[in-house]
Amino acid sequence: MSTYLVFGATGNVGRRVAERLAWSGAAVRATSRTPEAAKLPRGVEVITPDLDAPGALDDVDAAFLMWPFHSAERARPLVDALRRRVRRVVFMTGGGTLPAVAPEEQPNPVARWHATVERLIERSGMGWTVLSPSTFMANTLWWSAQIRAGDVVRGAFGSLAVTPIHEDDIAAVAVHALTGPGHEGRRHTLTGPEVLTQAEQVRLIGEAIGRPLRWQELTPEQERARLLADPGFPDGFVGELLDGCTKMAAAPPPEVTSTVPDITGTPATPLSVWAAEHAADFGGDRR
């Protein structure tokens, strides 16, 4: 039986890819830095992300790959290892990577790293599919501490519009691309079903937890100071984040794509549903 290799299998998307494959009866090998704590479905083989380890790529037909590293220097040896044994790779890109734009011309460091990995995969000789998702709905968890503490979320760019996507919708498309025909050599742009500002997202979370919430606008400089004071936020990314938000706020609103329903046959999940699923994370009752 062919085996599917899932990288980042304890992350927001990788876990759901591994679960969906396992529930379908497929053989799954998943990578985790802490295999003993992975808590994946029974039958999933969990290994460390060391492709030089004996048996790591045995019988692997296709791989789901994401890139969590803060550089692209590990990409070439990883792609080289995959291309010697694996027929197909589905890569989840990120950072607002622009298609058909050279890595060095991408708009930010994260996009440059992801574009570098994309280029290596596309030139590897493997069958490939690139998934380019919009903002994860899970990113709203950045506000969870503020919401648990009160009824106001403070931040800059409250009018910034995005098309947030449920992580399980990304996973559903990934499984189709891993297991089905018609996806090789294609880039799938994935969005949720609606365009929402940050302030509107906060309102919908409030509705999900049964408590009115409101957005309080900060200036970019106030937001910079807030992020720099947050021990959980890397100082080196504060400037890049604010610059990126400034550019996004000045750009035309994003468009909703039909890729998720076109591929999966199921409508993309709205934020209201995701927020209800995660109500407990914001101090509400899980529904």
PLM-predicted stretches and their roles:
Residues 2-41, 52-55, 60, 66-76, ...:
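Oxidoreductase cofactor-interface core, primarily capturing Rossmann-like NAD(P)-dependent enzymes
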Residues 221-287:
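A hydrophobic C-terminal alpha-helical subdomain
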Residues 49:
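Cofactor-binding loops of NAD(P)H-dependent oxidoreductases
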Residues 217-219:
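NUDIX/MutT-family hydrolases
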Residues 44-45:
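A detector of mature, structured extracytoplasmic domains
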Residues 60-61, 265:
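An amphipathic, basic-hydrophobic alpha-helix
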